[in-house]
Swiss-Prot record:
Gene: nanE
Family per record: Belongs to the NanE family.
Record protein name field: Putative N-acetylmannosamine-6-phosphate 2-epimerase
Isomerase listed as a keyword: yes
Segments traversing the membrane: none
Amino acid sequence: MGKISKEALKEQIKDGIIISCQALPGEPLYREEGGIMPLLVKAAQEAGAVGIRANSVRDIKEIKEVTTLPIIGIIKRDYPPQEPFITATMREVDELAALDIEVIALDCTKRERYDGLDIVDFINQIKEKYPEQLFMADISTFEEGLTAYEAGIDFIGTTLSGYTSYSRQEEGPDIELVDRLCRAGIDVIAEGKIHYPDQVKIIHDLGVAGIVVGGAITRPKEIAERFISALHK
């Protein structure tokens, strides 16, 4: 698909589930030669997914061969000692922009960045360089979400709540954060620690623009661990 208007994308993803299909080195479904993520995407599509979130140029290229669903793309690349690793610099934005995908997601937390830029300055740079591209901010707090939205980011994702040292630490999704962002009139894509269908229904009814579910669907090891640990509580 590629470039799409914000309103058209909102219409396409509303009332549905975007499924995150990712596997990193060291995880059971990761293979150096690839080929696994397209199979997960085909399963997600057959189930009725309205979009896909995917990581890396290789995976996204393979996924585009098997689906026309809108893609939220990221590149996870470490830049130690700085913590942000989700589309953390212009290098990753450039690589994703070349793939002609619907949405590019990036870390928009307040943490120190590898490029040394303030997050608003970085947002201004990417918006200027790619004015027709839709962007999603991965944030961990209300303040981060508000800052990114006011700077021109199209969608605010609650992806990193619980994954920064200063954000709310919960086993499940940060429903309070989702609700607060929605009440502020922000286009929210809820994501992060959504493990059960009843959580999806609660989040949907808050008025989100979209919902991303990942590990609870596409990480078999994580799913198995949840069942096994239930026997030992």
